[in-house]
C-alpha cells in the first residue's frame, strides 16, 4: 500500500515568504515608473505656462516703456535734425532740329570715351534728316527735351560760338581741318562720327587755247583802211571773268568746347555758285561732239590737291 505524505507546516511558511517578496518588488517598479511619468508631465505643463506668461509680460511692459520713451525720442530727433539743404533744381534743356539750321554741340565733358579711327568711322551709318525744301524751313521741327547735367565749362560755349560767314574772294584761306558730327538716338548719345577731309580744291587749266575770233580786225595792212586801236578794242570779245575757287570754311581737328552753327542753305548756295563758275569756264572753250566728249572733258580738266601745301 502506498503511503501519502502529509504536508508539513514549515513548508507553508516558506512559500508565503517568497510570494510576498515578489509582489513587493513589482509594486516598487511600477511606482517608480509612475513617478517618472508624472515628473515629465509636470515639466511640460510648467514650460508651456511659462512661455505664455512670458509673452503676456513682454507685451505689457513693452507698451508701457514705449509710451514713456516716445515723447523723449521725438524731442531728441527735433533737436538733432539738421536744417534741410536746398536741392539744386534739375536742368531742362530743349533743342530743336531744323533741316535748314542745325546746331552741333559736343557731348558733356564728364563722359570720356574712346574715339574710333577716322577710317573706321567713315563707314559708320549716320542718322541724317533729309532736306526737303531749300527755301522754306521745316514746318514741324522735331523737339526733344531731356535732363542733362550742365558741365562746368558751359559758360565758355557762348564765348567760343562761331558761324559760317558767306564766302568772298578776298577772304583769307583757312588751313585744312576736320568736321565731326555726333547725333543722338533715344536720348542717348549714339557714338558715330563723320570725318571728312575738305582740303581738296579744283583748278581749271585750258589745254588747247581758243581759236582766234573772226570778228577781230586785221592789222596786216596799216594803210588807209586801218582801224584805230580804240575801235579795235571795242570789237574784241569780252573775256569771261576769272573767278577763284570756292573756299569752303573748315573746322579745327581738335575737339572744341563751343557750339558751331551749320547753315545748309548757305552751303547749297556756295555749291550753286561753284557750279555756275565751272559752267562759265567750260562754255568759253568749245568741246568736240560725239563719243569723244568724255575724252576731251577728261583732257581739259586738271584736278590738283592742295592738302600738302
Curated annotation (Swiss-Prot):
Q: Which UniProt keywords apply?
A: Coiled coil, Cytoplasm, Developmental protein, Differentiation, Membrane, Spermatogenesis, Transmembrane, Transmembrane helix
Q: What is this protein called?
A: Spermatid maturation protein 1
Q: What is the lineage of its organism?
A: Eukaryota, Metazoa, Chordata, Craniata, Vertebrata
State the compartments where it is located: Membrane; Cytoplasm
Membrane topology classification: Single-pass membrane protein
Q: Does the entry feature the keyword Transferase, yes or no? A: no
What's its job?
Required for proper cytoplasm removal during spermatogenesis.
Any Gene Ontology biological process: flagellated sperm motility
- Protein species of origin: Homo sapiens
Report the superkingdom from the record. Eukaryota
Entry coiled-coil feature ranges: 259-285
Per the record, what is one GO cellular component?
membrane
Region named Disordered: 209-231
Give the principal location in a single coarse category: membrane
Q: Where are the transmembrane segments?
A: 29-49
Amino acid at each position: 500500500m502506498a503511503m501519502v505524505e502529509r504536508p508539513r507546516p514549515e513548508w507553508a511558511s516558506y512559500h508565503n515568504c517568497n510570494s510576498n517578496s515578489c509582489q513587493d518588488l513589482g509594486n516598487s517598479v511600477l511606482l517608480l515608473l509612475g513617478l517618472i511619468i508624472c515628473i515629465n508631465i509636470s515639466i511640460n505643463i510648467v514650460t508651456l505656462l511659462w512661455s505664455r506668461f512670458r509673452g503676456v509680460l513682454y507685451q505689457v511692459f513693452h507698451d508701457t516703456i514705449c509710451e514713456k520713451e516716445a515723447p523723449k525720442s521725438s524731442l531728441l530727433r527735433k533737436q538733432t535734425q539738421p536744417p534741410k539743404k536746398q536741392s539744386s533744381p534739375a536742368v531742362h534743356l530743349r533743342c530743336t532740329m531744323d533741316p535748314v539750321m542745325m546746331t552741333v554741340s559736343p557731348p558733356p565733358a564728364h563722359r570720356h570715351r574712346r574715339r574710333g579711327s577716322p577710317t573706321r568711322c567713315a563707314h559708320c551709318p549716320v542718322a541724317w534728316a533729309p532736306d526737303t525744301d531749300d527755301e522754306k524751313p521745316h514746318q514741324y521741327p522735331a523737339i526733344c527735351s531731356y535732363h542733362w547735367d550742365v558741365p562746368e565749362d558751359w559758360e565758355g560755349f557762348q564765348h567760343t560760338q562761331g558761324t559760317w560767314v558767306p564766302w568772298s574772294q578776298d577772304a583769307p584761306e583757312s588751313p585744312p581741318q576736320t568736321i565731326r558730327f555726333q547725333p543722338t538716338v533715344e536720348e542717348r548719345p549714339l557714338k558715330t562720327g563723320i570725318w571728312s577731309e575738305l582740303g581738296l580744291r579744283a583748278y581749271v587749266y585750258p589745254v588747247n587755247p581758243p581759236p582766234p575770233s573772226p570778228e577781230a580786225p586785221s592789222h596786216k595792212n596799216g594803210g588807209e583802211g586801218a582801224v584805230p586801236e580804240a575801235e579795235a578794242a571795242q570789237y574784241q570779245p569780252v573775256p569771261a571773268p576769272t573767278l577763284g575757287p570756292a573756299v569752303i570754311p573748315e573746322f579745327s581737328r581738335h575737339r572744341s568746347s563751343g557750339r558751331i552753327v551749320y547753315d545748309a542753305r548757305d552751303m547749297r548756295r556756295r555749291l550753286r555758285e561753284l557750279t555756275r563758275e565751272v559752267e562759265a569756264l567750260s562754255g568759253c572753250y568749245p568741246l568736240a561732239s560725239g563719243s569723244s566728249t568724255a575724252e576731251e572733258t577728261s583732257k581739259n580738266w586738271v584736278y590738283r590737291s592742295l592738302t600738302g601745301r
